[in-house]
């Protein structure tokens, strides 16, 4: 039984380590999401400024504005795609963490039962 407790302790340590790694990965994704959101907002703001512009310009300057708008639109689409990918990664991590947490909780229940059995055996002898 005590050997079983040692095995459970090792497994507990492994699960705690994996949970810690997943927590760090979740934080990294959240940070990336915030950076992506900030950049997307800046691009969107600039795009709105360009679209709201009124006036007259030469052909070359109008072409430059059009190219700027096309580039900004492409960047906005890229950020949207990146945000979706980050959200998918985050959901996968949440799912993996949930599964690990279930395993960890089950392991702790087993540990508690074994400890109670050992404790009862100790007091009965």
UniProtKB/Swiss-Prot annotation:
Keyword vocabulary terms for this entry: Protein transport, Transport
Any GO BP: protein transport
Domain of life: Bacteria
NCBIfam families: PRK15352.1 (NF011879)
Protein's name in the database: Secretion system apparatus protein SsaO
């Amino acid at each position: 039984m005590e050997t079983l407790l040692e095995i459970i302790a090792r497994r507990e340590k492994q699960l705690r380590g994996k949970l810690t790694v997943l927590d760090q990965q979740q934080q990294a994704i959240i940070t990336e999401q915030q950076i992506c959101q900030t950049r997307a907002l800046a691009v969107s703001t600039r795009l709105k400024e360009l679209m709201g512009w009124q006036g007259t310009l030469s052909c070359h300057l109008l072409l430059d504005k059009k190219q700027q708008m096309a580039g900004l639109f492409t960047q906005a689409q890229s950020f949207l795609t990146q945000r979706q990918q980050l959200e998918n990664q985050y959901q996968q991590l949440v799912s993996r963490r949930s599964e690990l947490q279930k395993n960890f909780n089950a392991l702790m229940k087993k540990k508690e039962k074994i400890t109670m059995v050992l404790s009862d055996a100790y007091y009965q002898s």
